[in-house]
């Protein structure tokens, strides 16, 4: 199952363009695409503000610092993630946090949700057999995640 999940994550990464500037040299800290309160009552404005201004910002700043110190700040996030295991933990962890938060802001929008379509749905069906099976495996991954983390 881990192989299927990794393949799907790689495919999703290739489909989602959070911000063209972010996917190239010269990393940028993206603007939040909606108000902090947009996900209430599910996620309150204070939590969103803390995640955006503190957590995401720290991941971004620490990633840029690590990329500069390791002389890889000329590489795009896409290039870094293609060989992520070759880089130090500071790049892997902060780069992952930086990207995951950008992804979060996009997929957790006030009008997001439901079943995908197009190439993403095709990839889910090819990988898991059905959207329902994907949901079940995704929920199981989330339930069994140790400590803090994302499924």
Go through each PLM region and give its residues.
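Bacterial Sec-dependent N-terminal signal peptides
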Residues: 1-25
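Feature for soluble, non-membrane regions of globular proteins
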Residues: 22-151
